[in-house]
Curated annotation (Swiss-Prot):
GO terms for cellular component: small ribosomal subunit. Keywords: Ribonucleoprotein, Ribosomal protein, RNA-binding, rRNA-binding, tRNA-binding. The lineage of its organism: Bacteria, Pseudomonadati, Chlamydiota, Chlamydiia, Chlamydiales. Pfam families: Ribosomal_S7 (PF00177). It comes from the Bacteria. It comes from Chlamydia felis (strain Fe/C-56). Part of the 30S ribosomal subunit. Contacts proteins S9 and S11. One of its GO terms (molecular function) is structural constituent of ribosome. This is Small ribosomal subunit protein uS7. HAMAP family: Ribosomal_uS7_B.
Length: 157
């Protein structure tokens, strides 16, 4: 165990337009090379496109619902017992749940071929809202992996 004190959680201020801390964290994850204004433009225009596509009057609520649909509940962690390594299913902590969902959405939005980031992000959010697409598939694969290794659940630490 580390002898140092636990790292303090950095407080992220709410974003200026919607007043949401979650959205500001999402913007920070989209940001590359410290260019926050570009990340903000991308996220806000993607949110507008997304809200139009799903027919939501409140883009923030729709975004939070899409994020909720992408959050994993279980994941597997490697645990070495004797000479064998087991994939042990564990519940995902609330903060990590948010973080994983955001990372997956951004990863698959960037992977969309021939589209700008804002179009890809809007499309991926629509897919998450409708419970389909690459992000939801990743979540289901994670859950399936945890379900398949349920026999090793007693190795929790």
């Amino acid at each position: 165990m580390s002898r140092r004190h636990a790292a303090e959680k950095k407080v992220v201020p709410a974003d200026p337009i919607y007043g949401s801390v979650t959205l500001e964290r999402f913007i920070n994850k989209v940001m590359m090379h410290g260019k926050k204004s570009i990340a903000r433009k991308i996220v806000y225009s993607a949110l507008e496109r997304f809200a139009k596509k799903v027919g939501a009057e409140n883009a923030l609520e729709a975004f939070e619902e899409a994020l909720e649909n992408a959050k994993p509940l279980l994941e597997v962690r490697s645990r070495r017992v004797g000479g064998a390594t087991y994939q042990v299913p564990v519940e995902v902590a609330a903060g990590r749940r948010d973080c994983l969902a955001m990372q997956w959405i951004i990863k698959f939005a960037r992977a969309k071929p021939g589209k700008s980031m804002e179009v890809g992000l809007a499309t991926e959010l629509v897919d998450c809202f409708n419970k389909q697409g690459a992000t939801i598939k990743k979540r289901e694969d994670t859950h399936r992996m945890a379900e398949a290794n349920k026999a090793f659940a007693h190795y929790k630490w």
